[in-house]
Regions:
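Short structural boundary motif marking the start of a folded domain
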Residues: 1-4
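Short beta-strand-to-turn element immediately C-terminal to the catalytic PLP-Schiff-base lysine
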Residues: 6, 45, 68-69, 97-99
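Active-site/binding-pocket entry motifs
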Residues: 9, 36-38, 102-104
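Short glycine/threonine/proline-enriched tight-turn/helix- or strand-capping micro-motif at secondary-structure
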Residues: 10-19, 48
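Glycine-rich beta-strand-centered segment in the early N-terminal region that forms part
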Residues: 20-36, 48-90
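Cytochrome P450 core scaffold surrounding the K-helix E-X-X-R motif
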Residues: 40-46
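NAD(P)H dinucleotide-binding glycine-rich loop of Rossmann-like/cofactor-binding domains
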Residues: 82-122
Length: 122
């Protein structure tokens, strides 16, 4: 899958083809439809955000998409569910694997783009 990767704070991010891992027992895999970008993401790219992951990493703190796989201990989501996820990183990719407790159900009345912009702002 394609993922925007940060490999150094003095280098521009670049798109890379990376493996999409299976979810752990408490995680969901999401086909990402939209990713919010905000001030915290800019700090991540500079390495100055309080929770900047170790290099290399995929930025993107908040996403919306469709669940495509659930870990064995996840009972509140099923494949096909629409969700918004405050993920902390990993959002600028085609798919992401996130802890299920960071996801909320997304009603059909909210678009993926709207949902991806809500989690940090509200």
């Amino acid at each position: 899958m394609l993922s925007l990767r940060v490999t150094g704070f003095d280098l521009p991010p670049s798109f890379c083809d990376v493996n999409s891992p299976p979810p752990a027992p408490d995680q969901i895999k999401v086909r990402i439809k939209a990713c919010g970008l905000n001030f915290a993401d800019l700090l991540l790219l500079k390495g100055t955000y309080q929770d900047t992951p170790a290099l290399p990493f995929t930025p993107g703190l908040e996403v919306a998409g469709e669940v495509i796989e659930c870990g064995a201990e996840v009972f509140n989501f099923t494949p096909g569910d629409r969700v918004a996820v405050f993920c902390g990183s990993g959002g600028l990719a085609e798919e992401g694997v996130f802890e299920a407790h960071r996801a909320i159900p997304l009603p059909d009345s909210i678009s993926y783009e709207e949902a991806a912009a809500l989690l940090i702002a509200y």
